[in-house]
Amino acid sequence: MLQCGVIVSLVMTGPAQGELMPKDLAPLVPVSVLSGADDVSVPTEFRSVSRRLFGRELFEGISVFDAIGAAEAVRKNSRIADLCEKIDARYRSLSWGRSQCSTLPWTYDRVSEQGHPLLYWDYSGLNEGLSDLPSDETTLVLGGVHPDELTPINLAFRFAQALRDDRALFAQHRVVVAPLVNPDGFFSIPARRTNVNGVDLNRNFATRDWWGAAWTWWKNRRQSDPRHFPGFAPDTEEGTRFQVDLMRRFDPDKIVSIHAPLGFLDYDGPGDNKRKNLSSFEKKARDLAYVVSRNSNNYRVLDFVFYPGSLGNFAGNERQVPTVTLELSSTNPRFADKYWREFFPGLKAAVKYEFKRSVLARMDNRATTTPSGTICCQD
């Protein structure tokens, strides 16, 4: 694989047109390129890189920044391909066949503690890849937060594939899908709820009550069960920061996080825990859970509690982003096809549900905490 330093060196000091390339660099470039052939066969690992990098244009008109960017694209695509191979192997062990990972245009900005890319896809309907769609509602779909809950991972990947397969169905809708928030836990044998540091990513968000309540809840309510360990401080884990990054960057109007095996829909957000006197905004936000339910064989909706450091607390309660937790009824991988048939209509309805809001300002008003536990909420 061409390394960044090699490309930059070639651009800055490369041979003049017609001059032979130094012998020690020649093996890095296909022979057909060196001969000036027009039908250059690009190796698999370079398929996403501009063909001109392999022709004579390599030494003509390409900037150092272009070369660095191309090298970075090669590196990222190679890491994504490696991850997809590992996911495919894990899928085969679960009798799921090949995953949808390698068929979709993932990207990543962070890696896990063990170096696995934290994948996401910013889907923008028929205008895929564009970011200038301010009128579009944005839905964030999360899977694999607790990877021992196997069925949500399958459902999240299949939903991403459905977006790709029928783009007209979701035209004018933006969906950001992160199907495997905790890859390290997924690749453990057996799969584990926590990440490699032993932290529950759904108890590690920097909620206002984290310093005062997270450890108390863990010790008293969970008897210090290591599967629910919230970490030594909030927002310490790559998987937690990854989810916060997605919320900051894409400003979602609604969030669907897929879990198992409790068997219900839980809503957190505007109007949660209110029995009457809801505003029209609160009513419309709460209706998101019931829309998903009606399109999923009337799956039951419960007003479940939220925990210190949880996504529902962080996004739904504190930042008023309508957040639905879809709890499948089993983690058994044999039910993956059943859950796809049952819940794809509900996920589709969630994306199409008209609800526009702005969270970006609230993201900057998150609670600030100190190691001593003092909390000061910015206005």
Describe every region a protein language model picked out.
Residues 114-123:
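A short loop-to-beta-strand scaffold at the N-terminal edge of the catalytic core in hydrolase folds
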Residues 1-3, 13-91, 215-379:
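C-terminal accessory segments enriched in acidic
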Residues 6-7:
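Hydrophobic helical h-region of N-terminal Sec-dependent signal peptides
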Residues 130-134, 209, 314-320:
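Short glycine/proline-enriched loop/turn "hinge" motifs that connect secondary-structure elements
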Residues 104-115:
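N-terminal cap/lid segment of alpha/beta-hydrolase-fold proteins
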Residues 112-114, 149-152:
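Phosphate/oxyanion-binding active-site loops and adjacent basic polyanion-contact surfaces
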Residues 133-140, 150-276, 335:
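Active-site/substrate-binding loop(s) of hydrolase catalytic cores
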